């Protein structure tokens, strides 16, 4: 059974900025729509098998690479919460590294 997918405020803001960047760069929302659809489809597959992702240094946080993006999330028996979405071409996020 697939988990319910939720987005944190941070990941929602990050996703909006990513989509706006591609809208401006391409002069059209077409690519952004396709990108969003592919990201959501990937998250739906991830919600079915969240352990098919990579563990982080924190036991409750995992990450997944999809279409050039790093998706950081946590999950429990009922939901998968997307914590962050960033371009894999950027510096890796250090927000979820156990200190």
Each predicted region: which residue ranges?
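Enriched for short, Lys/Arg-rich terminal
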Residues: 66-69, 74-99
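Short, glycine/charged-enriched secondary-structure capping and boundary segments
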Residues: 20, 61, 96-99
